[in-house]
Amino acid sequence: MSKPDRLAILALAVLAVAASSAQAQHQYIGYVYPAGGQQGSTFAIRLGGQRLTYASDPVVSGEGVSVRLIAYYRVMGNQEMSLLRQQLRTLQKKGATVSDAMAAKMAFFELPKRVKPPEVRGIVCDACGRLNPPFATVCSNCNAKLVKPKAPKPGKPAAKQTPSEMEAARQKLIERIQRRFAEDERNPAVRAHMELVFAEVTVAPDARPGRREIRVITKHGISNALPFYIGQVPEVARRPMKTCRKPVLGKEHLAQRRRPTDEALVRVTLPCTMNGQIAAGEVNRYRFPANKGQRLVITTKARHLVPYVADGVPGWFQAVLRLHDDEGNEVAYNDDFRFDPDPVLYYEVPEDGDYVLTINEALFRGRESFTYRITIGELPYVTSIFPLGARAGQPVKIEANGWNLDDTVLSPPAKDAKPGRHLIAATRGNLMSNDVPFALDTLPECRDAEPNNAPAKAQKVTLPIIVNGRADRPGDWDVFEVQGKAGQTLVAEVHARRLGSPFDSFVKVTGPDGKIIALNDDHYDAASGLNTDHADSYLMAKLPADGKYFVHIGDTRRHAGKAYAYRLRISHPRPDVELRVVPSRICIRSKSSVAVTVYAIRKDGFDGPVKLSFKDLPKGLVSSGATLAAKKDVTRLAIKTTLTEMEGPLNLTVIGSMKVGEKTIVRQAVPAEDRMQAFLWRHLLPAETLPVLVYNPSYRPPTDRIRPPIPDSIRPKNAKRTLRKSTVNWYLRQIESLYQQWYLTDDFANRQIANIEARLIR
């Protein structure tokens, strides 16, 4: 796609976003922390976002993962926070008590579980800092004598007193309010992260490891999806950071997080996955023991957790890893893995000792959504495969390159897998490596055969064909000879970067006289939403005469190696279209209608109309479909409902059908979110599902708490009447809201109401 075409799509995206403002105002989550957990574990998470009122249990895609809502913290106004502050002071007074109803409520009320680092178990050497087993007497690293921590002096055992039910309720209410204050930030850097959802995740022992997606469901809609990973090794998580304060020029230090000294460095044992968040100016450190000969793989997920940031350059969390030995020497460094911004390190341990891994943001930026997951261990990791794909239904042997791949098996997709992009992984027993993409197609395939680096030695191929090749040596060119006729159109398309290969292709077509007919370096693919390095080539060339032609392919930077693989399709045009539906969830008001935006990424010159529709809509939902006009790239698809509300979301499917000659082709649309990167660029970020929810906009939770009558004895007698009725009603709504959320006691609420009503101007 040319630059003007790309800018046209960006302009259409902006218009579509403006047209779908109703959809854009629905629920949003900006981060989840921690962004995953181990198989067979139960752990606490928090999600930050906006418009999450009346949240219910979040959902994670796939099988084997359940999520339970614990609490929701909305953004409270200044008056509400003032009321809570007064209530807290009242509860902390000597003799303060609560009602029977409050005691009964607090007895079953669950506070959000804390996310915190593991406790250090063992003896830390004062000389070198090595963590030793609790029973050790000398350090295993430097042989220094270990000093065991002194046990507390025995004193007179305190009489065990179980607090009364009323006292326990009072203490829990105090803690609840204190936690609410601890999370409050009046001047946040990112207002879209101010609302918090606290939940508990349970992962089954047999849950498939890898990437999932998590969403928050509310009574008023569904949030966007965020990546959520299931791991296979033990995990630790640092304490979550409070919502970042907005930095002020010249006083940026006031917005930085001041981590307690005991949290500056976390001790872990391998293998391990570490979860954390990066604040502005912060460096997170992890100390671990390693033995000589260990082959450690250190992988990071940072940009993969929150792919795009709209208000920053670079438009994501650019993580930097450094590994230091016991003496503080830097022994390894990485800030990306090839074209992937998330760093990966491989380190063969030269000698026994403690090592310290650090992570920071490249520009020392930070915010609560700069979350990361680092996994360290002697774990299998696939760096490249060959070939990058195969013909659907045909057997193929895949060569895997990487680290710690001894005794692993890398299997292709199932024999009945459909054409498209699939994820495969190397396995050793139940242990899985990272996922790598593998393409399936219906065209015949072959391998490139050396020597074929010049037209005189060109490899002859018959159209259509997909060539699986790679750059064997620096400056290598692969040349393929094809037969063509005058007026025919020849297509040459490379899939390399989109399949995880570092190969930066350059393609050209020449005639028998060596004259260049067409060439291309980079081609923008809007369907590749997570990719910002569009290095794959694509060209269409009209042949001037009958005869032989040569298709040349090489690496632009003259790089080569086993990892530099490619798939080159040489064929006549295969008119097609890829569809994206935005947003990736549909929220419909009672007995109303909405419209989603459908984008078409046209292939090989297809410019015909596309008929769009929802497939197998459930009862109560109807759509008359839509037609994407010829040569257009975006349209709207409406859906309406006769329902008042739905109990829960259902997944929908959008399909598009088109005529290519006498053949009808049907394509399924991929749900996506329209995301901005670095103030300008927009990307269609794919999601796994397209859920729909019909909601009742007038829903309010039942008021299950009845306030007792206000005694005349607490009503002020001679209060100055300075408040209008509208102001009084506003105050009363604030009090009633907190009261129904069980933040206020009966006595405190009645006294506040009495004071406000006494100031009403009559």
Where on the chain are the PLM-derived regions?
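Short Cys/His-rich micro-motifs in 6-15 aa windows
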Residues: 143-151, 757-761
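Aromatic sugar-binding surface patches on proteins
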Residues: 182, 189-200, 340-343, 408, ...
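Surface-exposed binding patches on compact interaction domains or structured appendages
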Residues: 56-116, 155-189, 605-627
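Bacterial N-terminal signal peptides
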Residues: 8-18
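Ligand-binding face of N-terminal immunoglobulin V-set domains in extracellular IgSF glycoproteins
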Residues: 39-51, 60, 82-96, 164-229, ...
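Acidic, Ser/Thr/Pro-rich low-complexity intrinsically disordered segments
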Residues: 25-90, 267-432, 440, 444, ...
